[in-house]
């Protein structure tokens, strides 16, 4: 099992940040450096400098890399917004192929698709330009990623799926269908951006996915500061340890001031690195 953190490339020059990272963590998720807008800012013109920097740091310190993320409705480059239908679909699959091929053999697990299910009680797919290319786009992405990098574990990643609810059940049904039909999916990521309470069926939910024959991973953990914060970090860790196929936990940053929700002081280290 691993314990990881999300890392932006520019923080690798911050000695306090890297000191904690290299001492306490053994896996890295690039925060933004492998997203579509970063890696293919213009169509068919790929840019990997920042992502490569993160991979190099990980390799130098014996850390795993979770690739994040090949296809997502957000943080798309402007040119993608002008495409639709089969033109967009082919650009999507070309992007998956090119990026996964560039990092072939260097990525422990890829978030192939991120956040493709709707919030609320429908359990349905989120409407997006990706979804409008046809409901089979997720399957196509996983098959394309497997062809490009057969050794990487291929994950589906989402948020608000931390307990058993309509959204997590929608994801569950997709994963079950994929496993039944032999679509290559190896893991499911649970972002776990949490408030002050943990769903009481958190571990049960992880286990039901594991029972489908996939690994489960906590991928973007952060927890609102308060009297329950330490207890919740412990509870999430214990839940993962109790599920044999829960292969690791990643916190979404290192120090509170690194966090996208820094006002919540949600991470394990404070802004002074303590």
Where do the protein language model's features map onto the residues?
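Substrate-binding cleft and catalytic face of glycoside hydrolase catalytic domains
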Residues: 23-43, 47-162, 208, 225
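Structural recognition of alpha->loop->beta junctions
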Residues: 21-27, 86-88, 94, 98-108, ...
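Glycoside hydrolase catalytic-domain groove-lining segments
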Residues: 49, 53-64, 132-157, 164-247, ...
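Boundary/entry segment of secreted carbohydrate-active catalytic domains
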Residues: 1-31
